[in-house]
């Protein structure tokens, strides 16, 4: 799930990425906003409900592709993304519009 909160400057938006992943040991959000670096933006698990979450400030008016990397072995999309596009590997990437 994506939550977008405009920042006071009007030039950036705080994007909170959330993924229910009960039983997962690790989740990262990976996309063109971080060079597809699997280690750049790990999500933290909330103890009460098992949802993994992280926030990133991104420039307004941009379009980003991303996916979640779970337990260093599988990809998953955000099913509340703004859109989806084929990624060239026979799957789709999630799309975020800021």
Regions found by a protein language model. Give the residues of each.
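Extracellular ectodomain segments of secreted/surface proteins
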Residues: 1-12
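Aromatic-rich carbohydrate-binding modules that target alpha-glucans
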Residues: 11-61, 71-98
